[in-house]
Amino acid sequence: PYTTLVRSNLIDLFMQLRMLSLHNERLSEIVFSEPEKELPARRVFDENSGVKLEIKNLSYQYDPFSQPIFSNFNLQVEPGESIALVGPSGVGKTTLLKVMCGLLSPTSGEVIADNLDIYKIGLNNYRLGTACVLQEDRLFSGSISDNISGFEDNADEELIVECARRSNIHDEIMKMPMGYETMIGELGLGISGGQKQRLLIARALYRKPSILFMDEATSHLDLKNESAINQSIASLSITRIIVAHRPSTIASADRIIDLSQYGKQAS
């Protein structure tokens, strides 16, 4: 019994140390990041039109003492093309997507959008032409309309409805107690995981992005909803970068990039 107790305590201690290590990795990601430089705001890309995206010799590591998540990675995405990033867990798919959309700064290399270095035009301006739907994204306490528009003053009601239709959730919204003014969140109506994902997609589309980044953004949807959304977004001719595991999601892309095939270049 004593040996069993000691073994159990050692396992608990190991798990605590492992969790502390993970927290330290995330903290170092913040500490070692340089402050962003903002330039005067301007829309760099045309609304709802595809942008050419080039990744040149891209490398990323959490801090100077850790192994690179990926190194010397190169990729070219044509305007309006959809790319699926695939590979086993831990290969760097989400990290690569976050670097491409400007949420993480690369250790080295370049992200070029329509022949413009995203850091030279200013990340604030780059983000004006992009939208992201990430796994950790959430909705906020407020109306459905507010959540789709990002709580924008003088929101475009017609655009809100259009984005909801493209996200295949308009009909469900109209069946709710107050339609688009239905409150959700802590004090409002509870919604399903699939409804949440579709509202997050609608919120991204409201930004009229030229590039749309999606990380497992349709993982809770049935095939019918997923197919309808993919077809609707494809009709916009915007550039899409998708991280996915589901075969149906991967099959919707124009091209598949398997990061595990890059060996040390994307591991």
Pin down the residues of each PLM region.
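Short, small-residue-biased leader/transition segments that mark boundaries at the very start
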Residues: 1-5, 141
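Cytosolic ends of transmembrane helices, especially the final helix of ABC transmembrane type-1 domains
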Residues: 6-30
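Primarily ABC-family ATPase nucleotide-binding module
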Residues: 31-83, 162, 235-236
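Short beta-strand immediately N-terminal to the Walker A/P-loop
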Residues: 83-84, 132
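The feature captures the beta-strand-to-loop junction immediately N-terminal to the Walker
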Residues: 86-88
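Helix-to-loop junction immediately C-terminal to a conserved catalytic motif
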Residues: 101
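Conserved ABC transporter NBD signature motif
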Residues: 109-116, 126
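ABC-family ATPase nucleotide-binding domain "signature/switch" substructure
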Residues: 130-131, 136, 144-147, 163-167, ...
